[in-house]
Amino acid sequence: MLFNNITIALDMSGCPNRCKHCWIGHFKNGNMSIEDLKYVANSFKDYTNSLEVYSWFREPDFNADYKKLWEIDNELSKNTKPKRFELLSFWRINRDEEYVKWAYNIGVRRYQLTFFGLEEKTDYYVGRKGAFNELINATRILLENKIAPRWQIFVNKDNISEIEKLIDLSKEMNLEERCKEFGEEFELFIHQGSCDGENEKLYDIRITLDDLVNIPKEFYHRLGKREKDLYGELINDSSTKNLVTDFPVFYITSQFDVYPNYTSIAPWWYLGNIKRDGVKKVLDNYINNRSLGQKSSLEVPIKEMVKVCGDQNSNRLFDRDDYIIYIINKYCRNNIKFL
């Protein structure tokens, strides 16, 4: 059993936010040690040609020892190095004067900030008061340090009236011009996000076709198709999908439970526990599609799942891949009691 590359991401410290769009899901913050990180990394090393190690999978750099952990992530990785993926912590940007300078020095040039409208809506969706003002302040601090902010806006029926106001705010702040001053581009994009984890709870308020009048046309390309149209495509689709790859990414919780990063952390994706079962059994479960999620994707045609879990009359908008993940999760939730 030898993979080409394995990526492992541990939830060492958790997250300061409880965002209502979080596709991973909500659970308690952990307090894993550096020894735990080393133990997990060393457990995987013999099963892969290269190993990419991350000490977080929710909020990057939330741990007070973030600098040391980044060094350890690099040291524990095998034949490769961890990446930043345009991700930082706006929570830390507002509390640590050294943080953005450090981020620039390790190569970060862009960082994605997430908004849900103006102050009240963004604070509500992030799950803590003051989040909106922290995002605006983080934008200013990034610009001062020649890191380009990218604004992503999550849209639902309850915040769509604020989208154009947020776009106007980005123009008032001259973000496009400010980024050009140091050779970067400002990007703002709008989407609903996936429909798994916490975001699945927002299914009822997903935008529909008639809501598009409230969004400038240049942002339509990320908003997808009506559910009824996707239903019509998939109801005739007999395909199944093997989710096993030679480059898997695994999430390890603070309790050492392992899940693939395909979608949210849910019981039907559980692969085992490193301490209780050992890495060999976890990987064997993955390779042989033993979780209900992987097994269903491999054995049940998507048309059978959409038939019982889709809505052929719905005008809600979805990206096609996100819709398929939503259907698989819903199917598994309905069937896990039969395991």
Question: Which residues does each predicted region cover?
Answer:
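Alpha-helix initiation/capping motif
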Residues: 33, 88-90, 118-120, 128, ...
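Conserved glycine-rich "GG(E/T)P / GGGxP" loop and the immediately following alpha-helix
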Residues: 7-13, 21-181, 188
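Radical SAM enzyme [4Fe-4S]-AdoMet core and its adjacent flexible, acidic
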Residues: 32, 116, 124, 128-254, ...
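N-terminal pre-core extensions flanking Radical SAM catalytic domains
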Residues: 1-28, 249, 279, 318-339
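General structural signal for secondary-structure boundaries
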Residues: 1, 25, 33-36, 89, ...
